[in-house]
């Protein structure tokens, strides 16, 4: 799982919009303010519009603005809007193909890590980040080791038979 530069730029652009939710911002201005090439910013805009996070208005006075409250946009939604589904390993992808599915000792590890990452990023909203730039809200369950899910006992000895 890699958080791409595209996601980083998307979050910066969204932070600008979240500071003034009624503000209509041209993509060119957003690109200049976060120091990203215009064509790259347009690609980011497309993903955010498709996800319903921002709306795009055409015309000489057009631009983008948040379509929903910053408090209703999770960081996971942004990540998945610009870079697709979050997966820790190919075997945990929605259409993942693994020849060892059902016998691999590591699949539960990757699936658990993926679930924790998704839950964590779902627990933090764009509003949390904008309001608390240095201290984003973190669900306390992530600090509690007892809250981690349990997995079936591995019986494959983690090697090919």
Predicted region positions:
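Short helix-capping/hinge SLiMs at alpha-helix to coil transitions
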Residues: 18-22, 68-69
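Short coil turns linking two alpha-helices in DNA-binding domains
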Residues: 37-40
């Amino acid at each position: 799982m890699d958080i791409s530069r595209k996601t980083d730029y998307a979050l910066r652009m969204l932070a600008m919009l979240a500071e003034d939710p009624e503000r209509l911002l041209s993509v060119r201005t957003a690109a200049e303010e976060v120091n990203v090439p215009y064509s790259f910013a347009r690609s980011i805009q497309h993903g955010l519009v498709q996800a319903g996070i921002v709306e795009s208005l055409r015309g000489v006075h057009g631009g983008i603005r948040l379509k929903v409250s910053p408090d209703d946009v999770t960081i996971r939604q942004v990540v998945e809007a610009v870079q697709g589904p979050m997966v820790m390993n190919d075997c945990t992808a929605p259409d993942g193909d693994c020849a060892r599915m059902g016998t691999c000792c590591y699949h539960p590890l990757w699936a658990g890590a993926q679930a924790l990452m998704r839950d964590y990023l779902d627990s933090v909203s764009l509003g949390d980040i904008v309001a608390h730039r240095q201290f984003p809200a973190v669900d306390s369950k992530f600090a509690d080791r007892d809250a981690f899910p349990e997995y079936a006992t591995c019986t494959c000895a983690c090697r090919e038979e």
